[in-house]
Design a protein with these regions (language model features):
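Short, well-ordered alpha-helix to beta-strand connector turns
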Residues: 236, 260-261, 284, 333
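Intrinsically disordered, low-complexity repeat tracts
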Residues: 493-504, 513-517, 521-524
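Redox-cofactor binding/interface segments in oxidoreductases and associated redox assembly factors
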Residues: 218, 289, 317, 338, ...
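Rossmann-fold NAD(P)-binding glycine/threonine-rich loop
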Residues: 301, 305-310, 319-335, 342
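Glycine-rich phosphate-binding loop and adjoining beta1-alpha1-beta2 segment
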Residues: 241-268
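Acyl-CoA thioester-binding alpha/beta core of soluble enzymes
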Residues: 1-246, 282-283, 307-322, 346-347, ...
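A structured beta-alpha segment of the ubiquitous adenosine-cofactor-binding alpha/beta core
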Residues: 262-308
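Active-site PLP attachment segment
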Residues: 331-345, 350-356, 360-375
Length: 525
C-alpha cells in the first residue's frame, strides 16, 4: 500500500477527479533514492500520479473480464522516467546526442522592471518569429539587451498577441492571484465530461491486456500528448499517430515517445487527407490531440464536428493552459508552465537566479494524467456510452506540484548512472538496431506492460494503414537490458537530470551541461 503522505495526497487528488474510486491497497511502492534535487518532491509527485494510472488500468481491466491485479512502482524509477529521453540509447549510444535545443532563444532573461521572463523558440518558425518580435539577433547578449528594454508584462502580453511562447517568472501566490491561476485552481487534475449518453460502441471482453482492441488516433507533438499514446499502447491499444508531411520533428524526443505506434504522414488540410482522417476517426475509440482548439475548429473538428464523425468518441485534449480560461489560446511549453505557475520561483529560492527543475515534470506527468482520464472515460463509456471529453494541462500539473514543497535538503540524491539502466532499463530490437530505454514504470501482477512495435520514424507506415484485428498479439518483445549489464552503454553521463538553467543569460537545454560538453568533445570535425 502507498503510505508516503505526499504520494497518498496526490493519488487521492487524481482519484477524486474520476467517476469511480481507486484502491491504493493494491499498490506497492519501493522507496528508493531520488535523483532530481528540488524543494518540490518530484519523485513522490510522480509516484502518486503513476500509481493512479496503474489504478485506472487495473479498473478497466477487471471491468473487461481480467483478474484483479496488484501493482508495484519504484520511487527512483518514477523520477528517472521524467527524463526518459536522456535514458534512451540505440546500439549503446544516446539518442539525445544533439545540440539543437541550446539556442539562446530558449531561456530566461531579466526584464526592464527587474523581473524575469522565460521564452521558448525551439522550432525554426517560432525562433524566427520570436527574434522578429524582439527585433534582435539570435545571441544571448542581443536577446538580453532587447528584453531589458521592456517590462515583463509588456513582453508577456506582446508575445501572446504575436502567438509566441513567453511567460513571466511568477511566485506561487502571484499565480493564484492572477485570473488564469485562479481559473486553473478551480479545476481538477484531469477533467472528464460527457456530451450525451447512449451510443452503440462498447469494448469486447479483453483478450490479454486491459486496452486490447482500443483504437487511438493521435494528433500530437513533442512530449505530453505523445506520452498519452505511448502509455495507452503499453496496455494493448492500437495507436495510429498522424503527422503532417513536413514539420518540426525534434527527433530525439520523437523516438522516446513513439513506442508502440504506427506513424503515418497525412496532410489533413487537403480534401483527401481529411477524408482519410475522418475514416480513421469514425472507427476509433479515442482521439488524442495537442492541437489548439481553434486549429481543429478551422478543420471542422470542433466538438460538434467530431461528434458527427463519431458519436462514441473520447476526445482527449492536452494543452499548456486549460480550455475555457483567459489564456486558453496561448502557446506554452514545459518551461513556460514552470515559469508562470511559480514552480521555477519555488525551485530557485536558494539559487542566484530563476532555474527550472531538472526533469520535464509537466510534459511527462501531464501525459500520465491524460492517459488516466482517457482510460477512465473508456470505463465510463462502457456504462453510459456517448461522446466524452478529457482535458489535461501543463499548468494544472505544474501548479499542483507545489503542494509537495519541503526543504530540498530533506533527503539525499544520487545521479543517474549505469546501475539505473541495469535496474530499470530494457532492450528491444528494431529494424534500426537495439534500443535501450527505461521499462514502463508500473509493473502489474498479471498483465505485463509492453509495446509490440519499436519506436520508428515519421511516416514509417503508409497512410492507407487500417486498424488491426482485436486479437493481434505477441509475446513480450523486450528483455532486461543486456547491453547495460555487459557495459555496452557507451555514453551515459552521470548527472542529476537535464539541469536546465535560466540564469538571466538564456541557456535552456534538454541535455545536462556534462552531456553537452561530451557532445562537443566527441565531434569528428
Amino acid at each position: 500500500m502507498i503510505t508516503n503522505p505526499i504520494q497518498v495526497s496526490i493519488f487521492n487528488a487524481v482519484a477524486d477527479a474520476l467517476p469511480f474510486g481507486l484502491d491504493k491497497s493494491k499498490v506497492d511502492v519501493v522507496e528508493a533514492t531520488a535523483y532530481s534535487p528540488s524543494p518540490i518532491a518530484i519523485h513522490d509527485y510522480a509516484v502518486g500520479i503513476m500509481a493512479a494510472y496503474g489504478g485506472v488500468v487495473e479498473h478497466l481491466g477487471t471491468q473487461r473480464g481480467l483478474p484483479d491485479q496488484t501493482m508495484s512502482l519504484n520511487r527512483r524509477h518514477c523520477g528517472l522516467a521524467l527524463n526518459s529521453g536522456q535514458m534512451h540509447f540505440l546500439n549503446g549510444y544516446g539518442t539525445l546526442m544533439d545540440t539543437w535545443p541550446i539556442g539562446p532563444d530558449n531561456g530566461t532573461y531579466r526584464t526592464a522592471d527587474d523581473r524575469y521572463a522565460t521564452m521558448i523558440g525551439l522550432h525554426p518558425h517560432l525562433r524566427d518569429k520570436l527574434l522578429g518580435f524582439l527585433d534582435c539577433a539570435n545571441s544571448a547578449a542581443a536577446i538580453g539587451r532587447s528584453v531589458q528594454k521592456r517590462s515583463s508584462s509588456e513582453l508577456e502580453e506582446g508575445a501572446a498577441a504575436a502567438g509566441l511562447a513567453l511567460g513571466i517568472v511568477r511566485s506561487p501566490d502571484e499565480w493564484l492571484d492572477h485570473p488564469q491561476g485562479a481559473a486553473t485552481a478551480q479545476r481538477p487534475m484531469v477533467e472528464l465530461r460527457s456530451r450525451g449518453s447512449g451510443g452503440t460502441r462498447r469494448l469486447r471482453e479483453a483478450f490479454r491486456r486491459p486496452l486490447d482492441g482500443v483504437r487511438v488516433v493521435e494528433l500530437t507533438h513533442l512530449i505530453a500528448g505523445p506520452t498519452i499514446g505511448k502509455l495507452l499502447s503499453e496496455q494493448g491499444a492500437d495507436v495510429i499517430k498522424v503527422q503532417p508531411p513536413m514539420g518540426d520533428w525534434v527527433l530525439p524526443l520523437w523516438l522516446d515517445v513513439s513506442w508502440g505506434k504506427r506513424n503515418i504522414a497525412l496532410d489533413i488540410k487537403s480534401k483527401s487527407g481529411m477524408a482519410r482522417l475522418a475514416a480513421l476517426l469514425a472507427d476509433a475509440d479515442v482521439l488524442v490531440s495537442s492541437q489548439r482548439p481553434e486549429a481543429l475548429a478551422r478543420l471542422g473538428l470542433d466538438l460538434d464536428g467530431l461528434s458527427r464523425v463519431n458519436p462514441d468518441l473520447i476526445f482527449t485534449q492536452v494543452s499548456c493552459y486549460i480550455p475555457d480560461s483567459p489564456w486558453a489560446a496561448r502557446r506554452g511549453f514545459e518551461q513556460i508552465a514552470q515559469s508562470v505557475t511559480g514552480v521555477m520561483h519555488a525551485h530557485s529560492e536558494d539559487l542566484p537566479a530563476p532555474t527550472v527543475v531538472s526533469v520535464l515534470l509537466n510534459d511527462y506527468l501531464t501525459g500520465y494524467l491524460g492517459a488516466i482520464g482517457t482510460i477512465a472515460a473508456l470505463s465510463a463509456r462502457e456504462q453510459a456510452g456517448g461522446f466524452w471529453t478529457v482535458v489535461a494541462s501543463l499548468t494544472k500539473c505544474a501548479a499542483t506540484s507545489l503542494s509537495t514543497l519541503r526543504p530540498a535538503d530533506s533527503e539525499p540524491y544520487a545521479p543517474a548512472s549505469t546501475q539505473d539502466l541495469i535496474d530499470f532499463a530494457i532492450d528491444q530490437a528494431s529494424p534500426s538496431g537495439v534500443f535501450t530505454r527505461l521499462a514502463p514504470t508500473v509493473a502489474f501482477s498479471h498483465t505485463p506492460s509492453y509495446v509490440r512495435r519499436a519506436t520508428n520514424w515519421p511516416g514509417t507506415s503508409p497512410d492507407t494503414v487500417d486498424w488491426e484485428a482485436d486479437d493481434a498479439e505477441s509475446d513480450v518483445p523486450h528483455v532486461p537490458s543486456v547491453l547495460a549489464r555487459n557495459g555496452a552503454i557507451r555514453n551515459l553521463v552521470p548527472c542529476y537530470g537535464i539541469e536546465d538553467r535560466g540564469d538571466g543569460g538564456g541557456g535552456l537545454s534538454l541535455a545536462s551541461p556534462l552531456l553537452m560538453k561530451l557532445v562537443q568533445e566527441s565531434r569528428q570535425f
